[in-house]
């Protein structure tokens, strides 16, 4: 089996087809997307960025959301904007951070809402891997970022790729709950067109908008929507010790 560097490393020749093999069944679902001209340009851009300085997440974590949540298992999609831009934080899952990293403010606010909504007991870590393994696709709209510069990789092509992911999830015949927090994420609602799906929208859990986020009870609403469709609800309680991704 190829190692992560060969699967997710960047090609030396920008004109060469990117050697990208998406994890599991996503490779078939998104067949042809990584050979599109925009993706070749994006891949070359990320290569240049990695050569110039730190870019997060690490190459082996680039597609962690897809690796941990196969297409066939997706029941919930929680959309973030771009990865955390501090050293050691991002590991390819929206809102989640690596074990041992301080829980960021937005995730602290998510924990507060979980506590009030479903009786959640916050762990000391910020790893959401256990959600991903239950079918919660923790997807950022932009999959890479330059260290210390939020949104530095916006508008380079990732949005086209992740829009393709959202469209693919929209085509699932079983119910998926799309969770769109904040104005940026809410613009993606137009990609969700199939009537079996449910969209839950609210303000973002960022400290700048948390007053309008708290009290929206998204987690109990997600589970109610899943159960109404005969699907197993998500166990939102995170383990005391983080799962290894």
Swiss-Prot record:
It is found in: Cytoplasm. The keyword Repressor does not apply. GO terms for biological process: base-excision repair, AP site formation via deaminated base removal. Coiled coil: none annotated. PROSITE patterns: U_DNA_GLYCOSYLASE (PS00130). The keyword Iron does not apply. It is an enzyme of class 3 (hydrolase). Pfam families: UDG. It comes from the Bacteria. SUPFAM superfamilies: Uracil-DNA glycosylase-like. SMART domains: UDG (SM00986), UreE_C (SM00987). It catalyses: Hydrolyzes single-stranded DNA or mismatched double-stranded DNA and polynucleotides, releasing free uracil. InterPro entries: UDG_fam1 (IPR002043), Ura-DNA_Glyclase_AS (IPR018085), Uracil-DNA_glycosylase-like (IPR005122), Uracil-DNA_glycosylase-like_sf (IPR036895). Belongs to the uracil-DNA glycosylase (UDG) superfamily. UNG family. This is Uracil-DNA glycosylase. It comes from Deinococcus geothermalis (strain DSM 11300 / CIP 105573 / AG-3a).
């Amino acid at each position: 089996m190829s190692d992560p560097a060969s699967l997710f490393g960047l090609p030396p020749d920008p004109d060469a087809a990117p050697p990208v093999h998406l994890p599991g069944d996503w490779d078939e679902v998104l067949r042809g997307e990584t050979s599109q001209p925009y993706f070749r340009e994006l891949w070359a851009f990320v290569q240049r960025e990695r050569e110039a300085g730190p870019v997060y997440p690490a190459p082996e974590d680039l597609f962690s959301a897809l690796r941990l949540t196969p297409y066939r298992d997706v029941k919930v999609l929680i959309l973030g904007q771009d990865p955390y831009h501090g050293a050691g934080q991002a590991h390819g899952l929206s809102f989640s951070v690596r074990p041992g990293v301080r829980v960021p403010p937005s995730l602290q606010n998510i924990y507060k809402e979980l506590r009030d909504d479903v009786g959640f007991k916050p762990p000391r870590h910020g790893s959401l891997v256990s959600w991903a393994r239950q079918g919660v696709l923790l997807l950022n709209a932009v999959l890479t970022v330059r260290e210390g510069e939020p949104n530095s990789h916006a508008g380079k092509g990732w949005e086209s790729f992740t829009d393709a992911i959202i469209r693919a999830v929209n085509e699932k015949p079983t119910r998926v709950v799309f969770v769109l927090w904040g104005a940026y994420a809410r613009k993606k609602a137009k990609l969700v067109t199939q009537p079996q799906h449910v969209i839950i929208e609210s303000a973002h859990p960022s400290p700048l908008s948390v007053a309008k986020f708290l009290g929206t009870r998204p987690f109990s609403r997600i589970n109610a929507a899943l159960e109404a469709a005969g699907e197993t609800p998500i166990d939102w309680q995170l383990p005391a010790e983080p799962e290894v991704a």
